[in-house]
Amino acid sequence: VAKYVKDGRLQKLLSFQTLYIGISPYNGPSIYTIIPMIESIYGVWFIKGGMFTMAKAMASLFEELGGKINYNCAVEEVLIQNGKSGGLSVDQQKIKSDYVVCNADFPYAMKNLIKESTYKGKYTDKKIDSMKYSCSVVLMYLGLKKKIDGLKVHNIIFADDFDRNISDIFQGNDPKDPSIYIYASTKADSSLAPQNKEALYVLVPVPDLSARKKRWTDEEISEYKKVIFSKMKKIDGLKDIENLVEYEKIYTLNDFESRFNAYNGATFGLAPTLGQSNYFRPHNKFMPIENLYFCGSSVHPGAGVPIVLTSAKLAAAELRRDVGSL
């Protein structure tokens, strides 16, 4: 970007989007500069009710088509027999199936759900540990007791020293002066909060576990919340942010790792480096095991909600192709 745009503010505006997929704008493949172009020229879709509406709609369609969803079940293993996936071990019970589609984070699945090293292919435990991972985030969901006129739908507060900010993230240091993205969903959809109140999604890129080398302590989370709030006070109406919050939920790499099985707490999965993109990214059809398919942010084509949905479409297409060949 700097080759064509000399103003440092515009450079940040046109390059920070690589953080949407957890990679440094200084090291990411230049193809990702297409993101701000798409946003500016075509815009982005908004789903009334938020992304949970998408999840509910997909679940509803799945059930309409005859599918059954089992909630609150721990998947322990992909069962393999004679080189074919034969079902799952769930809560210590074996459930047989002809095909398995796995949307668990690929590195986690390789290390925990595929038990026999024979069937891991090139993705051995050593290989998984040596791969490059995206950054993590500190994610805050905040409910405010009143409307804030100074907020837009999308709000970005850049670090004063953006270069240092990015360097800290990918060298394992919690940024002391972070860049912050604030999504005020209620500015686009008032149904997402009670009347005259505001719902905020606050995202702060930070190191993943492979870079940070340690999990967050409660004390560190509490202190970093102060750093984030201090930064948010730059927005008109948020000078007393501490007194406005009546609901708060904070996620760190600890939660992404424990709750969502994101390997290394890397929010966006495997980093989309040149050597981990396109053909070189884990495929949607897992060749070492017949009838096993993957979707999600760590497999082709990559991270981000629209891209992960595309990943699911590709996995479904591979499955349909194989079913049709029977």
Identify what each model region corresponds to.
Residues 46, 76-194:
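Mid-domain catalytic core of redox enzymes
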Residues 297-319:
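A conserved FAD-binding loop/helix module that cradles the flavin
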